[in-house]
């Protein structure tokens, strides 16, 4: 039997064939590494950052108005989750240019100098809380939103002043502000977002704007990208919380402060700021007892805005209005989006902001 000699096989010069030849006999791990490098070259930096954050199964975004707000309202919570290994991100809307300065020796600072000083205070506070991911909200051109300022109407209640800077957060296009927050949401991809209740805690116009813009931002972030939020992949936040305080403990603390003669103590039976809500509206309490030292260190860092009286019968902090506010070892929240989950405390409140959320969500 004879056979006809066959010509030697010709190399496959198609792209697929070339790729196969290039990988033949190579270590599979080396091939995988090259594939990852190729993906890295094709994705933009924001997309890569989003993928890297998914390595942290639990991610939480706090949206605040000024440096110091994060430590006052959510400092223990931030420290607790940072300590537990969650991805904790702080977004601050302004640099606090118009904050009322408490120390006389710093009263000379003009708005820009105060902003720089408060940025340094915030960096120190973040270090105390163990949080490394902080960013300021910016306009599309990269500039920041300025503090809108406020006036005190009465103890615990503020409002916008008569002369609002056109560069301020309160004067900005609300849809633009919401879209900028939505871009951060899509980048960070948090399961949980925390911000103010509709009254902004005590009426500060920047707090109110942050609440409104964050609510709108979450709608934009979950949308198809046709409006706002840039071109990043849509993201649906699982749970949204508002910062609140339960009325009964607040009034009890005010009574104790009044009984001890604390200067500036509010009326235990009088009106309260919007952050204080009926006890039954509090859905969640985060026990930050172990993080109180970190919270106090963060509050001390904001020396232009906060003074502390920790030796009083009720350990308290004071803002520029001089009214003592208890330094709580627990921080309270109201769930406004999502489903509550256990474990629950004796009063039926959640004890974990991530309760009920699967790590891969």
From Swiss-Prot:
Enzyme class: hydrolase
Keyword set includes Zinc: yes
Reaction catalysis annotation: 1D-myo-inositol 2-acetamido-2-deoxy-alpha-D-glucopyranoside + H2O = 1D-myo-inositol 2-amino-2-deoxy-alpha-D-glucopyranoside + acetate
Binding site for Zn(2+): 66, 69, 207
Alphabetized UniProt keyword annotations: Hydrolase, Metal-binding, Zinc
Positions of the UniProt region annotated as Disordered: 1-27
Gene3D superfamilies: LmbE-like
Superkingdom of the source species: Bacteria
Cofactor(s) named in the record: Zn(2+)
Enzyme Commission number, as recorded: 3.5.1.103
A molecular function GO annotation: zinc ion binding
Compositional bias segments (type: Pro residues): 1-12
Function: Catalyzes the deacetylation of 1D-myo-inositol 2-acetamido-2-deoxy-alpha-D-glucopyranoside (GlcNAc-Ins) in the mycothiol biosynthesis pathway.
HAMAP family given in the database record: MshB (MF_01696)
Protein name: 1D-myo-inositol 2-acetamido-2-deoxy-alpha-D-glucopyranoside deacetylase
């Amino acid at each position: 039997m004879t056979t006809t000699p066959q010509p030697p096989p010709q190399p496959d010069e198609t792209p697929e064939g070339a790729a196969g030849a290039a990988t033949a006999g190579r270590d599979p791990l080396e091939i995988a590494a090259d594939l990852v490098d190729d993906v890295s070259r094709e994705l933009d930096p924001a997309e890569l950052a989003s993928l890297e954050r998914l390595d942290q199964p639990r991610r939480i975004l706090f949206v605040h108005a000024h440096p110091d707000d994060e430590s006052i309202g959510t400092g223990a919570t931030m420290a607790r989750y940072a300590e537990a290994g969650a991805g904790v991100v702080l977004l601050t809307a302004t640099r606090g240019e118009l904050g009322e300065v408490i120390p006389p020796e710093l009263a000379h600072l003009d708005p820009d100098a105060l902003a720089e000083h408060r940025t340094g205070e915030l960096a120190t506070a973040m270090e105390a809380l163990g949080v490394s991911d902080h960013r300021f909200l910016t306009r599309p051109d990269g500039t920041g939103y300025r503090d809108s300022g406020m006036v005190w109407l009465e103890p615990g209640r503020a409002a916008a002043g008569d002369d609002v800077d056109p560069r301020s957060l309160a004067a900005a296009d609300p849809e633009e502000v919401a879209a900028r927050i939505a871009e951060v949401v899509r980048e960070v991809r948090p399961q949980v977002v925390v911000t103010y209740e509709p009254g902004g805690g005590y009426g500060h116009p920047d707090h109110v704007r942050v609440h409104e813009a964050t609510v709108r931002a979450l709608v934009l972030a979950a949308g198809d990208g046709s409006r706002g939020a840039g071109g990043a992949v849509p993201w649906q936040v699982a749970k949204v919380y508002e910062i609140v305080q339960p009325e009964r403990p607040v009034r009890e603390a005010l009574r104790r402060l009044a009984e001890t003669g604390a200067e500036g103590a509010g009326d235990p039976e009088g009106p309260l700021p919007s952050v204080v809500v009926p006890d039954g509206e509090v859905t969640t309490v985060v026990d930050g007892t172990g993080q109180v030292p970190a919270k106090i260190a963060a509050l001390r860092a904001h020396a232009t805005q906060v003074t502390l009286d920790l030796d009083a019968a009720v350990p308290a902090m004071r803002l520029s209005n001089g009214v003592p506010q208890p330094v709580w070892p627990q921080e309270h929240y109201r769930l406004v989006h999502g489903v509550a989950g256990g474990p629950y405390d004796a009063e039926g409140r959640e004890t974990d902001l991530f309760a009920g959320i699967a790590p891969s969500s």
